[in-house]
Swiss-Prot record:
Dimerization mediated by the LisH domain may be required to activate dynein. The keyword DNA damage does not apply. Self-associates. Interacts with NDL1 and dynein. This is Nuclear distribution protein PAC1. Positively regulates the activity of the minus-end directed microtubule motor protein dynein. Plays a central role in positioning the mitotic spindle at the bud neck during cell division. Targets cytoplasmic dynein to microtubule plus ends, thereby promoting dynein-mediated microtubule sliding along the bud cortex and consequently the movement of the mitotic spindle to the bud neck. One of its GO terms (cellular component) is microtubule associated complex. Gene3D superfamilies: 1.20.960.30, YVTN repeat-like/Quinoprotein amine dehydrogenase. Keywords: Cell cycle, Cell division, Coiled coil, Cytoplasm, Cytoskeleton, Microtubule, Mitosis, Repeat, Transport, WD repeat. PANTHER family: F-BOX AND WD REPEAT DOMAIN CONTAINING 7, WD40 REPEAT PROTEIN. GO terms for molecular function: dynein complex binding. Residues 90-123 form a coiled coil. It is found in: Cytoplasm, Cytoskeleton; Cytoplasm, Cytoskeleton, Spindle pole. InterPro entries: Dynein_regulator_LIS1 (IPR017252), G-protein_beta_WD-40_rep (IPR020472), LIS1_N (IPR037190), WD40/YVTN_repeat-like_dom_sf (IPR015943), WD40_repeat_CS (IPR019775), WD40_repeat_dom_sf (IPR036322), WD40_rpt (IPR001680).
């Protein structure tokens, strides 16, 4: 055996089969191309292939078989083995892809096992301190693991997601105007689905009413806003697992961008903002429009409500604070370079002095009930602002502070590579999602990014939701849900 034969990682039989496959492919190729495109070279090419077979094929029987198959009298016959080589080549490529997929799945499973082992260790050391079996401190310290607990698929891109305040149910709104309710313990089929709008749903909010008047029964309200210029209000009937429409709110003249529902005493109100540059306040019980004001010169994209105050973010790159009962604009924040996608108040939480921005710095801010807010923008940044105190007068609506009416940016979070779409605050953590297909967790105390989820979605991540930490009517749970352009919702649970 020669030196080059020793270097070839094939047995004699394997080498012979490979040579035959190569010759058969060359034979098929010259029949298909040379005879039609280079007819003048037909005989010379055919002779060269026959000569080559004499060198490569070891057995005389194999050579004779190939020569007879290559004879011109048999040119109408198609050897079924002539395409064996390209078929094998294609099979190898498919096998390589399959191997890569299996390796990725193995890595995912190994990571999931590590996360589960970590959770088991934490649970073994965990000591419950509250009646529901979880300490408030540990609940607020929770950061979701790398992989979701369940994956929900719908028919079109997910535009908004909301968790039921008390039950293991997630509400999903889509770009086709459909509204879904999924049981997180049996999510293969939705509990309910409804074509709630004729165009895309842009925003959704939920509220479990807490009427002190015994004549009114408490229930969950789901509010949706849409590109069809309408706002729909639904009652979630838990006993029948269905949406029951209460009313529609009409009045905006362009796309309704965001909607918010809240309760103060026995009064329930709904706030909405639109591309028509207005913000409207609605009475939940009768559907009347109580107030309309125009805080911005361009499209109002997002709002949040805290008591009698509304913060709004706009296409004009500013965010503004308004006293909604009077319509008085109180202060403005400038600093973003591109349109603002999301705004939120940062609520105070009790007994957490170690958490930055969650405790008032002065008694005046404590009495006012707010001090900080956060905004997310298309400029890829998230900014935390200190809101200036307005001039407060007894029995009168607040007015702007003549010496200080501008928000002060106290922290800028940078890390996303594209538009930041949504934000949610829980304890000392701020969660954000963006068009860079990632979800990030930030530490409010340090401003550092603690964790990044990069492979949750294959497209833009449009929305996310976590249980709020400032409402006693919401069950403290360790859950997070995300929704994306890839028609999927990822749910994380401990």
């Amino acid at each position: 055996m020669t030196n080059w034969q020793q270097q070839l990682p094939l047995t004699d039989t394997q080498k012979n089969e490979l040579d035959k496959s190569v010759l058969r492919y060359l034979n098929w190729n010259y029949k298909q191309t040379v005879r039609h495109e280079h007819a003048q070279d037909y005989e010379s090419v055919r002779h060269a292939i026959v000569t080559l077979s004499g060198f490569l094929l070891q057995e005389s029987v194999d050579r004779q078989e190939f020569i007879s198959n290559n004879d011109t009298s048999n040119e109408s016959m198609v050897d079924i083995d002539e395409l064996l080589l390209p078929k094998k080549w294609n099979s190898i490529v498919r096998l390589q892809k399959k191997i890569i997929e299996l390796e990725q799945n193995t890595e995912t499973l190994v990571s999931q096992i590590k996360d589960l082992n970590t959770q088991v260790s934490e649970l073994a050391q965990f000591k419950p301190t509250t009646s529901n079996g979880a300490s408030a401190h540990n609940v607020l310290k929770w950061i979701p693991r790398n992989l979701p607990s369940c994956l929900i698929n719908v028919e079109s891109s997910v535009t908004s997601v909301k968790l039921h305040p008390n039950l293991p149910i997630v509400f999903v709104a889509t770009d086709h105007g459909k509204l879904y309710a999924f049981d997180l313990f049996n999510y293969t089929i939705p509990l309910a689905s409804l074509q709630s709008h004729t165009k895309a749903i842009t925003s959704m909010d939920v509220l479990f009413t807490n009427f002190t008047n015994s004549s009114k029964k408490n229930y969950l309200v789901v509010v949706t806003a849409s590109k069809d210029l309408q706002i729909h209000v639904f009652k979630w009937v838990s006993e029948e697992c269905k949406f029951q429409q209460i009313r529609s709110l009409l009045g905006h003249e362009h796309i309704v961008s965001a909607v918010k529902i809240w309760q103060k005493n026995n009064d329930v109100h709904i706030a909405s903002c639109s591309r028509d540059q207005t913000v409207k306040i609605w009475d939940f019980h009768n559907g009347w429009s109580l107030k309309t004001f125009q805080p911005h010169s361009q499209w109002v994209r997002s709002i949040d409500v805290l008591g009698d105050y509304i913060i709004s973010g706009s296409h004009d790159t500013t965010l503004r604070l308004t006293h909604w009962p009077s319509g008085n604009g109180l202060s403005v924040g400038t600093g973003h370079e591109f349109p603002i996608e999301k705004v939120k108040f940062i609520h105070f939480i009790e007994d957490s002095p170690e958490i930055r921005f969650r405790t008032p710095s002065t008694d005046r801010y404590k009495n006012w009930g707010m001090q900080y807010c956060v905004s997310a923008s298309r400029d890829r940044t998230i900014k935390i602002w200190e809101i200036p105190l307005p001039t407060l007068m007894a029995h009168r609506a607040p007015i702007p502070n003549p010496t200080d009416s501008n928000f002060r940016c106290v922290l800028t979070l940078k890390g996303h590579l594209s538009w930041v779409r949504d934000i949610s605050i829980r304890g000392q953590y701020l969660f954000s999602c963006a068009d860079d297909k990632s979800v990030r967790c930030w530490d409010l105390n340090t401003g550092q990014c603690l964790h990044v989820w990069e492979k949750l979605h294959t497209g833009f991540v449009n929305c996310l939701d976590l249980d709020v930490d400032f409402d006693s009517n919401v069950t403290p749970r360790q859950m997070m849900v995300t929704g994306g352009l890839d028609c999927k919702s990822n749910v994380f649970m401990r």
